């Protein structure tokens, strides 16, 4: 399906909040990452050529750009656009500059280097970058001694980005909220929006329309001022 970005999601969200942006992006990101894992990665060996901007899984090769790197020694994240001494060609760092342009209000995307923690890590930053991208893309973590590079992958099969039906949406949504810290209302809204699924919303209810089936999600605010889902039912 044609890419729909998180940036024009109709629900209100704080453009300066990493948690809000992550919540919007996580649903679709997890879905497509899981599909890529099943269809492309599997048990294949992988290889990255950052100078050519290519990543290989087995015998399959795709275009890849460097988002940034995690350092286990310094416990920091460094965007590729800020790593001026890397020697990487412009085409390999273009995606990180695109993410910087797309998210001008998000401090973490405007700061070249910062400390890692539970929220600020390569996976979360990559999911937001993928969600804001105008293209259908996934990401991959490429470990090396002392850290890991996170790359954004282009040219993947379209089936990875196919629309999720009601069962797949619910299965993925429930799986995410079971073990991933996020705002459940923004997670649902961002997932449905990027999935191309019509939905209505207010502060405490989202109703999604999957053809003739309507699913209602009810939320409440928690003490840490994020939304938690209280009920999922069929209308």
Where are these regions (language model features)?
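Secondary-structure transition/turn motif
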Residues: 56-61, 82-83, 154-156, 209-214, ...
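N-terminal leader/presequence regions that precede the main folded/catalytic core
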Residues: 1-95
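Alpha-helical oligomerization segments
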Residues: 164-235
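Short, ordered beta-strand-loop transition motifs
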Residues: 43-51, 143-145, 200-204, 221-224
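Short amphipathic beta-strand/extended segments with alternating polar/hydrophobic composition
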Residues: 62-70, 152, 215-221
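Short, solvent-exposed secondary-structure boundary motifs
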Residues: 32-36, 117-133, 185-198, 207-211
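Surface-exposed beta-loop interaction hotspot
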Residues: 84-182
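Generic surface-pattern signal
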Residues: 18, 24-27, 31, 41, ...
């Amino acid at each position: 399906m044609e890419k729909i970005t998180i940036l024009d999601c109709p629900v209100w969200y704080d453009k300066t909040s990493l948690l809000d942006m992550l919540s919007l992006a996580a649903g679709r990101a997890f879905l497509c990452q899981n599909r890529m894992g099943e269809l492309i990665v599997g048990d294949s060996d992988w290889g990255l050529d950052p100078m050519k901007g290519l990543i290989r899984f087995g015998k399959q090769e795709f275009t890849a750009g460097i988002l940034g790197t995690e350092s286990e020694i310094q416990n920091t994240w460094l965007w590729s656009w800020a790593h001026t001494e890397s020697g990487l060609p412009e085409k390999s760092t273009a995606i990180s500059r695109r993410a910087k342009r797309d998210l001008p209000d998000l401090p973490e995307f405007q700061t070249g280097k910062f400390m890692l923690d539970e929220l600020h890590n390569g996976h979360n930053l990559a999911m937001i970058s993928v969600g804001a991208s105008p293209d259908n893309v996934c990401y991959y973590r490429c470990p090396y001694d002392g850290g890991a590079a996170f790359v954004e992958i282009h040219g993947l099969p379209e089936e990875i980005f196919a629309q999720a039906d009601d069962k797949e949406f619910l299965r993925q949504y429930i799986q995410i909220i079971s073990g991933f810290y996020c705002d459940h209302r923004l997670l649902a809204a961002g997932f449905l929006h990027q999935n191309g699924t019509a939905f209505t919303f207010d502060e405490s209810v989202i109703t999604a329309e999957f053809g003739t089936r309507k699913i209602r999600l009810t939320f409440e605010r928690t003490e840490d001022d994020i939304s938690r889902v209280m009920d999922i039912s069929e209308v």
